[in-house]
Amino acid sequence: MKKILIPVSIIAILLCASWKEDAKTVSPDRLFLADSGKSLFVTNRAGNELIKMSSDGQKAEQKVTLSSPVNAMTQDPSGNLWVVCDGNTGMMYELDGKKLSVQSKTKSGATPSDILYSPVSKSLWVTQRFNNELW
């Protein structure tokens, strides 16, 4: 398996450089891999966005704006991405893995902090940070 290591500072610089002039604030926060490590995603906390980077990490290819900042992401076997967002409008989103279009959304309270797909139980697990809950 080939490892690709891209320092976060380089991604932040490239993300800022590739951003359109009408964007006001870019705040790279979290990194996620999908498609067995072939797809790189970075979050823009200030813009409530999930951004798919090019495979070499040099430019932003796609983005989706969500209700609040992305805390975590996982992928199911069909390629759909599952994302939890925190804040007053905390949500769990199901996204089409290719188009980044929203397939479904579920209110999840204000504090979803992580999400994981379990291939054994074929289910999603979500933690609620301050509520001491595991869904």
Enumerate the predicted regions with their spans.
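Short helix-onset patch at the extreme N-terminus, typifying the N->h transition
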Residues: 6-9
